[in-house]
């Protein structure tokens, strides 16, 4: 097992439902530590830059519009196998296909308004964490 960091975003739909604390409890109960966190209302430019990997996909505009529709909670999670652990906690992208008890099964409404984002690999985790948090603002504990 490896100590890893991963980026997690609680998306506008879940923030609006006031379930940030419930989602944080799931992270902590799974052994993940929140080592950086901030609330933000993303600008269109930031959302487009963050999701640039999807720029040519048909859903890109809708994704960006959704991500700027309200505040998000952005956090860095740290722990053993944090990337996989967080992905397991999130569940399938489509909440209808997500296993019962996952964040998306419990809090998401649709494949678009799916409550959370999480890094999918070590390389993307490093880039995504750096996008939102300078190293000096991440505190291992």
From Swiss-Prot:
Q: Does the keyword Nucleotide-binding apply?
A: yes
Q: Which Gene3D superfamilies match?
A: Nucleoside diphosphate kinase-like domain
Superkingdom to which the source organism belongs:
Bacteria
CDD domains for the chain: NDPk_I
Q: What are the subcellular locations of this protein?
A: Cytoplasm
**What is the catalytic activity of this protein?**
a 2'-deoxyribonucleoside 5'-diphosphate + ATP = a 2'-deoxyribonucleoside 5'-triphosphate + ADP; a ribonucleoside 5'-diphosphate + ATP = a ribonucleoside 5'-triphosphate + ADP
A GO cellular component annotation here is: cytoplasm
What does the record give as EC number? 2.7.4.6
- SUPFAM superfamilies named among the record's database cross-references: Nucleoside diphosphate kinase, NDK
What family does the Swiss-Prot or TrEMBL record give for this protein?
Belongs to the NDK family.
State what this protein does. Answer: Major role in the synthesis of nucleoside triphosphates other than ATP. The ATP gamma phosphate is transferred to the NDP beta phosphate via a ping-pong mechanism, using a phosphorylated active-site intermediate.
Subunit text: Homotetramer.
Q: What is this protein called?
A: Nucleoside diphosphate kinase
Origin species: Burkholderia mallei (strain ATCC 23344)
What does the organism's lineage look like at the top? Bacteria, Pseudomonadati, Pseudomonadota, Betaproteobacteria, Burkholderiales
